[in-house]
Amino acid sequence: MELHNDEKRLLKAFQDSNKKIMNLEELSEYIEKEKVMRAAFWLSGRDFLEIIENKTRVCELTELGKNSLDSEIPERKVANYIKENNLESIPIKDLSKILEKDETGAALGNLKKKELVTIDKGNIVFKNLDYKDNEEEVLKKVSEDFNLSNYSEDEVKIIENLKKRGFLKINEVVDRSFELKSAGIDFIKNPIEIKEEITQLTREMIVSGKWNDYTIRPYDAKIPTEEIYPVKAHPMSKIIQEVNEVLISMGFKEVKSQIVQTEFWNFDTLFEPQDHPARDMQDTFFVKYPNTGIVPKDLLEKVKGIHECGTIGSEKISKGWCYKFDEKVSERTVLRTHTTVSSIKYLASLSETERENPQKVFCIDRVFRNETIDYKHLPEFYQCEGIVMAEDVNFDNLVGVLKEFLRKLGFEKVRIRPAYFPFTEPSLEAEVYMEGKGWLELLGAGVFRPEVLEPFGIKKPVLAWGIGLSRLAMLRLGLTDIRELHKNDIEWLKKTAVSEK
């Protein structure tokens, strides 16, 4: 192992002194004091020696403390003034004649606190002019002995009070010693050669051949250095960006929709009955203003027929939900509970010509649920969903798309389980395998039911899926509490890797 010359000089100091433990002053006889700590830090990183720190609290007199030591503390000045002038008392207002302006309040307060005086009709009356003051004694002692460890518990309390009064300050002094470890002991058993080092070659050295007289200092890429945290995006933003790039690379197009939606677009078009529990106030945020929105009448009639009896005009699609559909409910506004509404609105906007062409779209955006906040639920979170519409796509194609999508996100092991959603049939849940955690549910998917597509005149099959990005972020970042994502803990943000695939 090649050592720096300063490291060698430090080890040679141990070798020459025949000691295993040395302090800073002893080592500075062999190597400049400012280089000792740097060399010791390097050697401790190589496990050659251990840096031992001994912290001591010490007192230091302030200018006020020094002045009080040379003359008197304010309380004593007042007592001596009364004594020297043969007075029985002194009016409080006359304190300004004896003390500085900033001393009068503190002096009077301390005289009363120490129970040395009484106040009689605005006059200060001393009980004993020759009183003994512990603060004066401790202040004198501090001028001779700075080490707090040499003081009793009562004296330390007095010192703390003197600090509050500005007579002294308390500092922490760190004494360092350096002890050789086994690697260092083995190293100094052999002669230590110190050859002058250079960090760069000059033309003159090469031409004259003097470069042979020097050691060229090698670069050590493993030497401990200060950690630097560059500016970077929030981990959640990085995951959103990554998912966006993955889907675009798979040929998808991004679409958007508004946060506030009518129940028609958020629920009715997805064949979710109006009495479904998910539409209750405990699960959905209803908008107070505007509390209603505009619903396209032609689509409303078609969706209403599907819900009530499964028909559009005279065409029978299914049995429907067999209940009385309320158009007023469809007009109510909510904060969207999913981003699937973006895909539905996109499908509804397609012209007859566009419906003939394959479509692949996705949406990444915020959704809102009236959830109780806990370690795995938030009322606002990011969701990603997508659809594929084409002539011959089927359930197998859906599984293939999902596996490819998850593989690009870094999940090699994926398994599919059957599931139920009101607007897809068949439906599935995809689980991914993570070392140490096992199989974890990550997304839901399925094939849109005819009841969802027929009102828009779409005859081709449409594959649909959705994934909560907060859930993905928790898996990626090893979090057990979803709230940690949004606490903005600066230490966690600095130390979280830019990519966690």
From Swiss-Prot:
GO terms for biological process: phenylalanyl-tRNA aminoacylation. The keyword Ligase applies. It is an enzyme of class 6 (ligase). SUPFAM superfamilies: Class II aaRS and biotin synthetases. The keyword ATP-binding applies. L-phenylalanine binds at residues 340, 423, 448. One of its GO terms (molecular function) is tRNA binding. CDD domains: PheRS_alpha_core. Its cofactor is Mg(2+). PROSITE patterns: AA_TRNA_LIGASE_II. Binds 2 magnesium ions per tetramer. Gene3D superfamilies: 1.10.10.2320, 1.10.10.2330, 3.30.1370.240, Bira Bifunctional Protein, Domain 2. It catalyses: tRNA(Phe) + L-phenylalanine + ATP = L-phenylalanyl-tRNA(Phe) + AMP + diphosphate + H(+). GO terms for cellular component: cytoplasm. Belongs to the class-II aminoacyl-tRNA synthetase family. Phe-tRNA synthetase alpha subunit type 2 subfamily. Tetramer of two alpha and two beta subunits. This is Phenylalanine--tRNA ligase alpha subunit. The gene is pheS.
